[in-house]
Amino acid sequence: MKNYRIESDSFGEIQIEEKFYWGAQTQRSLNNFKISKQKMPKILIHALAILKKCAAQVNYEFGDLEYKIATSIDKAIDRILAGEFEDNFPLVVWQTGSGTQTNMNMNEVIASIANEELTGKKGGKSPVHPNDHVNKGQSSNDSFPTAMHIATVLATKQQLIPALNNLLTYLQDKSKDWDKIIKIGRTHLQDATPLTLKQEFSGYITQIEYALERIEDALKKVYLLAQGGTAVGTGINSKIGFDIKFAEKVAEFTQQPFKTAPNKFESLAAHDALVEFSGTLNTISVSLMKIANDIRLLGSGPRCGLGELHLPENEPGSSIMPGKVNPTQVEALTMVCTQVMGNHVTVTIAGSNGHLELNVFKPVIIYNILQSIELLSDSVNSFVTHCVKGLEPNIERINALRDKSLMLVTVLNPHIGYDNAAKIAKEAYKYGITLKEAAKKLNFLSEEEFDKIVIPEKMIS
């Protein structure tokens, strides 16, 4: 049989199962928003706990929290950060657009843990009050966007950047010995002039290098924190200097260069920094989609495709075709890319709906951004482990396709002119003969002259 205790808020009393630490406002949110099962991301809860810890420290230093209260709050938060109370943050994304209920969930749980330590009984509002003490000098309107920024930075630094660096390392490692492998290039999915396999992969490498640069550029605005703006940006009920000191505390705790936002009205009413950052994630997914699809095409076959790359064989590919193996890691990564692109559309629409002094699409913005970061990080790591590491060139196939390509004729342009070179290509294609044979047949070049000019190794700069 479940045991219950009574908690209260401005709406009155409400029953809460005794084993949980949350209070009345959290319970009301649970009762009122039974919408799907997408909970607030764990890293956002972690960021909100960091926020409360730093706020309590600043309030104590400003003389606004007595030592016993501040210490009990600090200890409670340390336990939350250590993962002791993960089941006490049950609220879904689909709640108030300011994130107020999740902010109060954190306030109530911290106060409840602290009160249990001080009195032996969880819950209640004394001696530690969720609003008067844990939320002191704060509003959900500045706390939740601050947590959004902290969570985005932490997730990016801990997950996405390492994953992209891992991909970059293995692309560089794989291609370093491919500078002597000359293959045919393709534009419009049609044969083009030659290049080396290393040159082809250098494009992918640069895309990932640029992706990492874009992340650092986009994070510059995400480092700016809204805390101190309180309700509408004026800083009501927050002391002068609280915002600066708070940002310094967060920077010290996280070892990230957080600063207070110069204009709190902007940081409450708009989320342009996160829309921009989501745009960076979108661009990264565009890059990854291109890279993955190229590898898929180059590995197509095994007998009737391009077949220039051997892709690792990880599992059976068909329930009806025996022996079939598919590029499943590519497929997983490209599906993730489409999801991230869709997430960016959501973030864009949500970001554009910051009406007057407060954007009230905050939970859906951060949910989609954090999902994009997680999906990209996990899928890139999987792609590296189960695909990129095992890529091998099919030298025989590469050479065969290169040597019968009609576009080697391009190098003849300076010697016999574009129109005559085009005639050679068309003649070779029409009669199924080599370029050399066509050049001789049309009396443009002898075999010896052709061999001196058409050298793939000299066509790659």
Curated annotation (Swiss-Prot):
Top-level taxon in the UniProt lineage: Bacteria
Swiss-Prot/TrEMBL GO biological process terms: fumarate metabolic process; malate metabolic process; tricarboxylic acid cycle
Site (Important for catalytic activity): E331
Pfam families registered for this protein in UniProt: FumaraseC_C, Lyase_1
One GO cellular component term noted in the UniProt record for this chain: cytoplasm
EC number: 4.2.1.2
Description of how the protein assembles with itself and partners: Homotetramer.
Record protein name field: Fumarate hydratase class II
Gene coding for it: fumC
